[in-house]
Amino acid sequence: MKFTLALLTTLCASLASAGVVITPVRPNQVIPANSGDCFFGVVTPQGCAPLRKS
């Protein structure tokens, strides 16, 4: 049980540090895109992200 929890925590930390965790953004966080910036989602000051609908 402890090993599984430690493994899961390590995996989550690894994915978060690699930038794999995707956080949807709201329309007021979007900035204008240059050509070729993002092939999916919208551009934010931190990078590309999916746009939250509401």
From Swiss-Prot:
It is found in: Secreted. Disruption phenotype: Impairs pathogenicity. Leads to clear reduction in lesion development on cucumber leaves. Induction: Expressed in the plant infection stage. Disulfide bonds join 38-48. Keywords: Disulfide bond, Secreted, Signal, Virulence. Its main location: secreted. One of its GO terms (cellular component) is extracellular region. Residues 1-18 form the signal peptide. It comes from the Eukaryota. Secreted protein required for appressorial penetration of intact host epidermal cells and for pathogenicity. Belongs to the MC69 virulence factor family. This is Secreted virulence factor MC69.
